[in-house]
């Protein structure tokens, strides 16, 4: 059975990696599908994100990494996937994901959505939070794979890390 795990992964976090690793135990193949979202300005290019994911999933024999644009369900159909794999951090994630699952099912009746709840230690984690912490010089080593922490450090090396008040006239 093929599962597609879609996302922007900008950057991939340990929460994402946890879902990938657990998905690999459940499915014959897990396709990590990096989306090219025209509504978001990414920190890393699609190629960089693919390389980051490839590096931190080398230990998983049944992972494929790919990129796509357009509807996730259309991509899943093209890949002949039976499952969309989604991670849930909180009830608020479930409300959104449930709506998406119903919409995807209406577009492609053969697709099922499987939700994996994140491990407790990652229930608060998001790529946006990781970027914010890294941007201001905080350590993200406990939030992302080691290769991604290095990439983030390089990316924000020129950003001032001290919080300072903004002078008002």
Swiss-Prot record:
Name this polypeptide is given: Phosphopantetheine adenylyltransferase
Family named by the database record: Belongs to the bacterial CoaD family.
Record site: Transition state stabilizer: 16
Origin organism lineage: Bacteria, Bacillati, Cyanobacteriota, Cyanophyceae, Gomontiellales
Localization: Cytoplasm
GO BP, one annotated term: coenzyme A biosynthetic process
Gene: coaD
Main localisation: cytoplasm
Keywords: ATP-binding, Coenzyme A biosynthesis, Cytoplasm, Magnesium, Nucleotide-binding, Nucleotidyltransferase, Transferase
Pfam family, one: CTP_transf_like
Catalysed reactions, as listed in the record: (R)-4'-phosphopantetheine + ATP + H(+) = 3'-dephospho-CoA + diphosphate
MF-aspect GO terms: ATP binding; pantetheine-phosphate adenylyltransferase activity
Positions in coiled-coil regions: none
